[in-house]
Amino acid sequence: MAFEFKLPDIGEGIHEGEIVKWFVKPGDEVNEDDVLCEVQNDKAVVEIPSPVKGKVLEILVPEGTVATVGQTLITLDAPGYENMTFKGQEQEEAKKEEKTETVSKEEKVDAVAPNAPAAEAEAGPNRRVIAMPSVRKYAREKGVDIRLVQGTGKNGRVLKEDIDAFLAGGAKPAPAAAEEKAAPAAAKPATTEGEFPETREKMSGIRRAIAKAMVHSKHTAPHVTLMDEADVTKLVAHRKKFKAIAAEKGIKLTFLPYVVKALVSALREYPVLNTSIDDETEEIIQKHYYNIGIAADTDRGLLVPVIKHADRKPIFALAQEINELAEKARDGKLTPGEMKGASCTITNIGSAGGQWFTPVINHPEVAILGIGRIAEKPIVRDGEIVAAPMLALSLSFDHRMIDGATAQKALNHIKRLLSDPELLLMEA
């Protein structure tokens, strides 16, 4: 009897995830804690280790497929472990019981109405729903009981489009799900015919998560963006002075830690920027902590690791942590815990050569600070035209919560601190 390894409960409220990559194949020998696969959810890519030592017999869930907690992913020849259970198996047993009940109900429905589609019989208040956490939240926000919605995604998964169709009084046809199951996951080959050849490929789990988060934020929060710039002559000199000292400590000192400190000070001065809105209860959540998300551009997509308690850390410590999290983001090693709990976010388009832009709020946060490149520009100082390094700043905010004048005052506060690093350190 083979040992069945099921998708474990990895915490963070995650009930399912996409199998991004398998690191083993049938016939491979694995040891305990060897990485079996990578699973992508709404928050991060998580490595799933083997709980036992044994030989891989069969991979049951291929790459690109969404699996639920408790679903068997792989079978192993691991003598002595055949009857061992792990966290998440209870969900699988419940799933089997529900499946039996569903079959029984379908038989009764068929006896009354043999021509009724089976897909319609599956939707109901007692069925088990497969849906990403973001879709479940979207359903709650729209006042929809997701158990009543017929899913058209792979394995009957409920998509955001299914919620919209339900609200519109209809549902997507069930055959679409069957077609998706039968369709190959590989990209369609390019056609050499015609003037405009095209290819198609499946969206990655991270790209889908980013797309859903961006659409949800723009649809939920009325965005307003203020654009300004700060004279960072003194800041450039300050960084230059301490850059070598930081290097001696093995730290790469950038301008980002200074921006983090300035933003934290602004959040303290204007606490409305450090809030969120509970759309279900219509309550304002005032956050009494300062966790700053740092948007990181990676080959897999945009990830946002979080600097916890940024108000308690000096510049060098912030620089070190930012560098470490950025490296983990690029290597795909971030854990869900390192990407949760942000109260406000910074995004940097300056590293790509950009200046002003309209950053999208990382909902449910209510503000996001965008920083652009530092460019030499002519300015008037003490009645004379001089060249000065100017830092482009873009502050997007949720107008439901923050008034324009308040946002501009907060941006002015940030500008003042970045223009005077000594004052910034006094504030910090």
Swiss-Prot record:
Modification sites for N6-lipoyllysine: K43
UniProt-annotated stretches for the region Disordered: 88-123, 177-201
GO cellular component: cytoplasm
Disulfide-bond pairs as recorded: none
Necessary cofactors: (R)-lipoate
Annotated Peripheral subunit-binding (PSBD) domain residues: 130-167
Highest taxon in the source lineage: Bacteria
Residue span, Lipoyl-binding domain: 2-77
InterPro entries listed in its UniProt record: 2-oxoA_DH_lipoyl-BS, 2-oxoacid_DH_actylTfrase, 2-oxoacid_DH_E2_comp, Biotin_lipoyl, CAT-like_dom_sf, E3-bd_dom_sf, PSBD, Single_hybrid_motif
Cofactor binding note of this UniProt entry: Binds 1 lipoyl cofactor covalently.
Molecular function via GO: dihydrolipoyllysine-residue acetyltransferase activity; lipoic acid binding
SUPFAM superfamilies: CoA-dependent acyltransferases, Peripheral subunit-binding domain of 2-oxo acid dehydrogenase complex, Single hybrid motif
Pfam families (alphabetical): 2-oxoacid_dh (PF00198), Biotin_lipoyl (PF00364), E3_binding (PF02817)
Reaction(s) catalysed (UniProt annotation): N(6)-[(R)-dihydrolipoyl]-L-lysyl-[protein] + acetyl-CoA = N(6)-[(R)-S(8)-acetyldihydrolipoyl]-L-lysyl-[protein] + CoA
Biased composition annotated in UniProt, kind: Basic and acidic residues: 89-110
Gene3D superfamilies per record: 2.40.50.100, Chloramphenicol acetyltransferase-like domain, E3-binding domain
EC numbers: 2.3.1.12
Family affiliation: Belongs to the 2-oxoacid dehydrogenase family.
Record protein name field: Dihydrolipoyllysine-residue acetyltransferase component of pyruvate dehydrogenase complex
Organism: Geobacillus stearothermophilus (Bacillus stearothermophilus)
Source taxonomy: Bacteria, Bacillati, Bacillota, Bacilli, Bacillales
